[in-house]
């Protein structure tokens, strides 16, 4: 089709355009890939608009059709491969007139725009003007009535791609967690030199007029002080900052000082607070050897983290579904996320609310600005302020409300355990509680509680826990042993050390431990105290939550491993790697990692493995490699959960593939093993650890002063904190409707309903495997869980033309 002459007849398939605009953000390529492949899967054609709105204005070769194989390998690439630009021409009506003409000439009547609030505002203006633009094009003689007839309605769907995370109505924007990862990596590296020389560092981070990056990096790195636009410091902040830093260094022995400054930081009179100003105050007033580090555009670069790959993929798929669902009078949606739930929000409302926040800040109504950011933002700010330093005299509780709170880790190590403990300790000290760490789990409690000179039950000091801010694993020690191994001694220790509450951090073993303690209350009154479980396991298999601490760290570690393996596979061209993942009898890690790395197939325990499945996948791989014809990035990855099959092990599958390939491709196996538990926790695990640990402490505080029988009678006195859909909730473990009875598959050590199962559909669809004889969801457990997913309410059974799918 000519770029200057539109056909009279509309194209046989609907054409969906996709563009990236404004500042680039990691994850944009994942969104484009998902839009392109979901469009093709849905029997549509996908067109990329290169260089953002500038490409729409210029048309011609800047609007090109993308095929299935064109977006192969894009998930691991940073930035945006279709380019981005801040178009001045598109801001003018004359530019939008050219853009409308170019879209009609290409037969495109739907546009998915990935960008910030400015880009999405431009998209909505474009849609509102669309009928008038077409009329003007006909009036000017540039197009005919016959040409514009099929394109009277323009559908716009927004994806928020921005490292700033400044869009209202969503918890996260595409790219924000990758940017946060860059910041945390940089500050973690600064720790060493700051500690060595007892220096102070003032770190300036991006974010424009939004303080999300600054706040989350302050939480993730344990910064001593923070400046964000939404909550400027009160007058006299210079004295407050110097007082806190002096106490942290001289009274508590902290050797390093970190201050995080958002680039839009200001005081309550809207005067800018620069990083150099803060540095001068620390140097002149405290005599502190201070350095300024401006991270700049390194925060935008590099590959997307696991969360941004996952988010961009699911939102890209949802954007295509939204296009196909839209009616002529439907408002333009923007695809958002609340906790773990993908949602559609009216684009106009989200943009207006975002602009309203900026106006409130300008009008000095900072409390209202904080409320409008989102519920999470204000909670995180509260949690940060109450854990960064224990100096909050107004927060101290009266003596009769103070508690002795025991903290224990149970299960395998997971990223975020230390950060949850640090947050709990910080909050306890702020409120006047006594935090007591039980070292080395229940065996440590029973066997070594009275060891000399140091027992396993020890009060935690602020400086000790502050050092855990970026440490992986478990500094107080963890294991899988349960209290049922010695109830007598466990109860005796509870009495001896006068535990008023128990905070348990861990995986399915932690859940089981609290269940056992709850059920033993009648025999052992010492267990009639409030107990709460904060799920922390890479397997993400704890009932009562859709997210466990450590799972994000594991995913990031695993995708780094897979990216390196894919490079090897692609360099050898015709090679398949079968990679074994951990996760026990839950396929969460394998499935979400498969989605994040673009795996060809994922084998999980919920589905099992049989010879027919392997035969279909061998045929699929053989056809894929035959079509590649020397194409680049031709390596394939298959992920297999360690418990997917006792017969078809990782090595056996690799050997079967190699044998059946008959020389057409090679196969290798790779087992990352305990490497998947990760090193330093990811920023997401760090910040969620803080928020959820503080919530747990608030929950335990509700029982202060109550009798043992009152506590035991309350089902919520033994609870699990978790993310369910778009909410953070506490769920009771006992009772007829409790987690133990209704949501726990004890035999398989996982929840009865696993929210992520529908992700397997997306892995198959986006790899092309769904057209290769493999049913979208053939798991035997689907009989038991026909509607297991509140998050991805998706029907993917669309009639497609198999020839539209080429290689994965």
Curated annotation (Swiss-Prot):
Residue numbers annotated as active site: 164
Region (C-terminal regulatory PFK domain 2): 404-808
Binding site for ATP: 23, 86-87, 116-119
InterPro entries, per database record: 6-Pfructokinase_euk, ATP_PFK, Phosphofructokinase_CS, Phosphofructokinase_dom, PKF_sf
Catalytic activity annotation: beta-D-fructose 6-phosphate + ATP = beta-D-fructose 1,6-bisphosphate + ADP + H(+)
Keyword presence, Coiled coil: no
Alphabetically ordered keywords of this record: Allosteric enzyme, ATP-binding, Cytoplasm, Glycolysis, Kinase, Magnesium, Metal-binding, Nucleotide-binding, Transferase
Annotated stretches, region: Disordered: 1-21
Residue segments, region N-terminal catalytic PFK domain 1: 1-389
Record bears the keyword Nucleotide-binding: yes
Gene Ontology molecular function terms on file: 6-phosphofructokinase activity; ATP binding; fructose-6-phosphate binding; metal ion binding
Known function: Catalyzes the phosphorylation of D-fructose 6-phosphate to fructose 1,6-bisphosphate by ATP, the first committing step of glycolysis.
Family: Belongs to the phosphofructokinase type A (PFKA) family. ATP-dependent PFK group I subfamily. Eukaryotic two domain clade 'E' sub-subfamily.
Protein name: ATP-dependent 6-phosphofructokinase
Organism: Aspergillus fumigatus (strain ATCC MYA-4609 / CBS 101355 / FGSC A1100 / Af293)
Gene: pfkA
């Amino acid at each position: 089709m000519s770029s200057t002459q539109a056909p009279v007849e509309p194209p046989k398939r609907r054409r969906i355009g996709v563009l990236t605009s404004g500042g680039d953000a990691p994850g944009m390529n994942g969104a484009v890939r998902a839009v392109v492949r979901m469009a093709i899967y849905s029997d549509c054609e996908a067109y990329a608009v290169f260089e953002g709105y500038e490409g729409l204005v210029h048309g011609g070769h800047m609007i090109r059709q993308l095929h299935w194989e064109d977006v192969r390998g894009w998930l691991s690439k940073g930035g945006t491969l279709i380019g981005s630009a801040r178009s001045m021409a598109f801001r003018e009506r004359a530019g939008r007139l050219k853009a409308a003409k170019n879209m009609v000439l290409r037969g495109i009547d739907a546009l998915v725009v990935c960008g910030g609030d400015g880009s999405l505002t431009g998209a909505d203006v474009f849609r509102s003007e669309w009928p008038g633009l077409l009329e003007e094009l006909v009036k000017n003689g540039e197009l005919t009535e016959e040409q514009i007839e099929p394109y009277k309605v323009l559908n716009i769907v927004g994806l928020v791609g921005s490292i700033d995370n400044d869009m209202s109505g969503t918890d996260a924007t595409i790219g924000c967690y990758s940017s946060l990862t860059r910041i945390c990596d940089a500050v973690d590296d600064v720790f060493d030199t700051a500690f060595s020389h007892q220096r102070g560092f003032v770190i300036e981070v991006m974010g424009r007029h939004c303080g999300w990056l600054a706040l989350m990096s302050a939480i993730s790195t344990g910064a001593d002080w923070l400046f964000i636009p939404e909550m400027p410091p009160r007058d006299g902040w210079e004295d407050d900052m110097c007082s806190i830093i002096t106490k942290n260094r001289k009274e508590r022995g902290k050797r390093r000082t970190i201050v995080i400054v958002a680039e839009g930081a200001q005081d309550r009179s809207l005067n800018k607070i620069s990083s150099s100003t803060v540095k001068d105050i620390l140097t002149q007033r405290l005599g502190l050897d201070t350095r300024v580090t401006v991270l700049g555009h390194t925060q935008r670069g590099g590959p997307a983290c696991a969360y941004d790959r996952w988010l961009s993929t699911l939102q890209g798929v949802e954007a295509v579904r939204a296009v196909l669902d839209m009616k002529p009078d439907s408002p333009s949606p923007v695809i958002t996320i609340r906790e773990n739930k993908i949602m559609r929000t009216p684009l106009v409302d989200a943009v207006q609310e975002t602009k309203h926040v900026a106006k409130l800040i300008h009008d000095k109504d900072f409390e209202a600005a904080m409320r409008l950011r989102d519920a999470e933002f204000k909670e995180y700010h509260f949690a940060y302020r109450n854990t960064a330093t224990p100096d909050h005299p107004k927060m101290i509780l009266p003596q009769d409300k103070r508690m002795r709170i025991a903290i224990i880790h149970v299960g395998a190590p997971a990223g975020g355990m230390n950060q949850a403990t640090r947050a709990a300790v910080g909050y306890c000290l702020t409120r006047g509680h006594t935090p007591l760490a039980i070292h080395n789990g229940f065996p440590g409690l029973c066997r070594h509680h009275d060891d000399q000179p140091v027992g396993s039950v020890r009060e935690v000091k602020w400086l000790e826990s502050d050092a855990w801010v970026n440490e992986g694993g478990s500094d107080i020690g963890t294991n899988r042993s349960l209290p049922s191994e010695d109830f007598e001694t466990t109860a005796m220790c509870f009495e001896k050390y006068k535990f008023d509450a128990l905070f348990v951090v861990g995986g399915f073993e932690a859940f089981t431990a609290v269940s056992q303690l709850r059920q033993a209350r009648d025999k052992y009154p010492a267990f009639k105290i409030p107990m709460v479980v904060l799920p922390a396991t890479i397997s993400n298999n704890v009932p009562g939550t859709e997210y466990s601490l450590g799972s994000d760290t594991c995913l990031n570690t695993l995708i780094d491993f897979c990216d390196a393996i894919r490079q090897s596979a692609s360099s050898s061209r015709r090679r398949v790697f079968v990679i074994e993942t951990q996760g026990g009898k839950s396929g969460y890690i394998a499935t979400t990692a498969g989605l994040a790395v673009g795996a060809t197939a994922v084998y999980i325990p919920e589905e099992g493995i049989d010879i027919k499945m392997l035969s279909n996948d061998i045929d699929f791989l053989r056809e894929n490699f035959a079509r590649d014809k020397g194409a680049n990035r031709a390596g394939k990855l298959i992920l297999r959960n360690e418990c997917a099959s006792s017969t078809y092990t990782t090595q056996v599958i690799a050997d079967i593939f190699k044998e059946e390939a008959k020389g057409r491709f090679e196969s290798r196996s790779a087992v990352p093993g305990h490497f998947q538990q990760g090193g330093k926790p990811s920023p997401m695990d760090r910040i969620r650890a803080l928020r959820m640990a503080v919530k747990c402490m608030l929950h335990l505080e509700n029982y202060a002063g109550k009798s043992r029988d009152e506590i035991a009678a309350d089902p919520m006195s033994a609870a699990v904190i978790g993310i369910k859909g778009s909410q953070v909730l506490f769920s009771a473990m006992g009772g007829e409707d409790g987690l133990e009875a209704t949501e726990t598959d004890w035999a398989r050590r996982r929840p009865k309903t696993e929210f992520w199962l529908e992700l397997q559909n997306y892995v198959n669809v986006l790899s092309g495997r769904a057209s290769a004889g493999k049913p979208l969801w053939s798991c035997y457990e689907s009989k038991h869980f026909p509607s297991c997913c509140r998050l991805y309410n998706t029907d993917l059974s669309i009639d497609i033309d198999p020839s539209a799918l080429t290689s994965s």
